[in-house]
Design a protein with these regions (language model features):
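Hydrophobic alpha-helical transmembrane segments
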Residues: 1-85, 255-260, 272-325, 333-354
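Secretory targeting signals
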Residues: 51-62, 110-179, 187-196, 202
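Alpha-helical transmembrane segments of polytopic membrane proteins
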Residues: 62-64, 143-155, 259-267, 324-335
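Helix-loop-helix units of permease transmembrane domains in multi-pass membrane transporters
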Residues: 80-116
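Central hydrophobic cores of alpha-helical transmembrane segments
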Residues: 176-186, 329-333, 354
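Individual transmembrane alpha-helix segments
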Residues: 240-268
Length: 354
């Protein structure tokens, strides 16, 4: 797994995506942080010029860079597994004197090293710029430690998920699509369940949503990033009391989710990494190019797609929680999915260039 030839081949296969990941990370994090300091300095000079009262404001969310960088990491994982399956490059790779498990671990470690390097470098640049720029007068750096730790864990979990999905899919399209579906499914499940309850019991659509959302929060990879906000605001009018009765006075209005939210992404890493190694070592090359490598899994995906697709169609077509219109939409959408999806899953995608 530490063979130089494997690492060089992995880099050559994905170098453009890797460089895109580095450039986007520095632009969306360090560059924007620096430009914000220049902007605030400019506001201060303008306020002094016009004798206005200056209010320093800085706001940084974790979810936005997670979604942006996570998307690129998904493309990276698709490039390392889905692309080589699609153009049959895996046949040559697996004929080399390397264990399949070592090939997979090399791909995983390659991505993890890039993630760790990017996060640590941006972490250090933030610390340097905070001390040397206008931010130093108004910020404390302690929230940024949690910010980058949470970012590191969540990005590793997203990459691990995308790579693991590549062990059950046969081309780059299905790997990317299925990764997105699995990632957002815990976000969509609460409104789907509460919507069905509302249609059948005339209970308010959002009444049951909170409890289901709390359950899904414990299994979502993105859970640690969803409510993470670093906010420095020197405006006394922004002081408030949160839902737990804690008084937040200016200037630091930072909101950091509890550490227990990290359990979900860490659990995904611990489960999906060995699962991915196991499945990759037993992948069937003869089904490369198909949307799914395992026929039994294809049946499960088909059943789930018909069922949940029907629910979505029923909720869209139901009017004012009308039960008949819900079932009409459910049956129509399920039939359309049942008719077209098996035909799509039989397609085989194969490109003969590398």
């Amino acid at each position: 797994m530490f063979q130089k030839a494997l690492w060089l081949r992995t880099y050559q296969q994905s170098k453009y995506v890797v460089w895109l990941f580095w450039l986007v990370s520095f632009y969306s994090l360090s560059y924007k942080y620096y430009m914000t300091s220049i902007q605030q300095q400019h506001f201060l000079n303008d306020n002094k010029k016009w004798n206005y009262v200056y209010h320093y404001h800085f706001d940084l969310t974790l979810l936005d860079p997670i979604m942006l960088l996570g998307s690129i990491l998904t493309i990276l994982a698709c490039t390392l597994i889905g692309w080589e399956r699609q153009n049959n490059a895996s046949d040559l790779l697996w004929s080399m004197p390397f264990k399949r498990s070592h090939l997979y671990i090399t791909k995983w470690l390659f991505g993890i090293c890039n993630i760790a390097a990017v996060v640590i470098l941006n972490w250090g640049l933030f610390a340097i710029m905070k001390r040397l720029t206008f931010h130093n007068k108004y910020q404390v750096f302690s929230p940024f430690h949690s910010y980058f730790i949470y970012m590191l864990i969540v990005l590793i979990a997203i990459y691990t998920l995308a790579l693991c999905v590549g062990t059950i899919t046969g081309n780059i399209i299905s790997q990317g699509f299925l990764t997105v579906v699995i990632f957002i499914f815990p976000l969509l499940l609460p409104p789907l369940i509460s919507g069905v309850i509302a249609v059948h019991s005339n209970v308010d659509f959002h009444e049951k949503n909170g409890r289901i959302h709390d359950v899904m929060e414990n299994i979502r990879i993105s859970s640690p990033a969803e409510d993470f906000t670093i906010n420095f605001n020197y405006d006394p009018q922004s002081a408030y009391t949160d839902q737990n009765g804690v008084r937040h006075n200016e200037p630091n209005f930072t909101k950091i989710p509890p550490a227990k939210t990290l359990i979900a992404p860490i659990a995904h890493i611990l489960i999906l990494l060995p699962l991915g190694i196991y499945l990759y070592a037993r992948s069937a090359n003869e089904r490369n190019g198909n949307y799914l490598l395992y026929p039994k899994l294809q049946k499960i995906v088909l059943v789930c797609a018909i069922f949940f697709g029907g629910i979505v169609g029923g909720l869209i077509l139901s009017h004012e929680q009308s039960l008949p219109s819900f079932y009409i939409g459910f049956l129509v959408t399920s039939f359309i999915t049942y008719f077209f999806l098996p035909k799509i899953l039989k397609w085989k995608v194969s490109w003969n260039f590398k």
